[in-house]
Amino acid sequence: MKIVVSPAKTLDYESKLPTTRGTQPEFLETASKLNRKLSRQSKKELSDLMSISDKLADLNYTRYQEFQEDHNKKNSRPAIYAFNGDVYTGLDSYTIPTDKLDKLQDTLRILSGMYGVLRPLDLIQPYRLEMGSSIGIERKKDLYGVWQKKVTEYLNAEMEDDEFFINLASNEYSKAVDTKKLKGTVISPVFKDFKNGKLKIISFFAKKARGSMARFIIDKDCKTLEDIKGFDYDDYRFSEEYTENENEPVFIR
C-alpha cells in the first residue's frame, strides 16, 4: 500500500527533531534546476508567479538565493517534520513512534512542486512552490509537465499490481500523478461533515482528515480496503449510504 499527500506552505525548521535520520530526495537534480530558474526571478516576479504578498516574496527570494544542491542535516530537514499545515496537524508526525519510521518511510509519499515526490525522511530545504505554479524547465511549460512522467514512473517502480494507492492529496497535487498509468487500484477517500443540517466537504476539516487517515494507516498497519474503512480518528466513520463509488469511500461525521 502506498499513500500520497500534499505538502504544506507552512514550514517548521525550529522544533527539536525526534530522529537523526535523513535520506536524499530522488529528484534533487531536477529540484536544483528549478531553483536555479527561480533564483533568477525578481521579488516582483515571484510575487506575481505565486500570488503572494511582498513580504512572502522577500522571504522566498532569500530562500532561493540560499538554496544549496548539497542537502545535509545542517541546511535541511526531513520533509515529514518540515511541513506544518493542516494535513500535518492530522498526521501529527512528531508523535509517530520511532519504531514506526521504517513503515512510514516505505508507505507515505509527499508530492512537491519543488522536489516532485518525497519520502518522509528525505531532506528538504525551505521553499514555497505550489504544483499549480506556471513555471517550467526542460522545455516544459509548467510543473505538471516537469513532474508527471517522473513521479508516475517513480511510484510505479515501487508498487505491485495488486497494491492499493491511497490518494490523500489535493486535486492540485493529484494531477501530478497520471493515475491511469498507475499500477494497482487508486482509492481516493472523501471526508464530509454535517453543517447546518447538510453534509458537505469543509476544506480545513478535509485536509486534517487526510493527514489523520494517513496516520491511521500507519498506526493500524492497514493492508486492505476493509482495513481503511475502519478509519475512526477524529470521530469520522465510513458511510456505505453516501459512498457511490467503491474507489471513493465517503467518511462522515
UniProtKB/Swiss-Prot annotation:
Similarity comment text for this entry: Belongs to the UPF0246 family.
Cellular component terms (Gene Ontology): cytosol
InterPro entries named among the record's database cross-references: YaaA
Transmembrane segment boundaries: none
PANTHER family membership: PEROXIDE STRESS RESISTANCE PROTEIN YAAA, PEROXIDE STRESS RESPONSE PROTEIN YAAA
GO biological process, one term: response to hydroperoxide
Record's protein name: UPF0246 protein GFO_2679
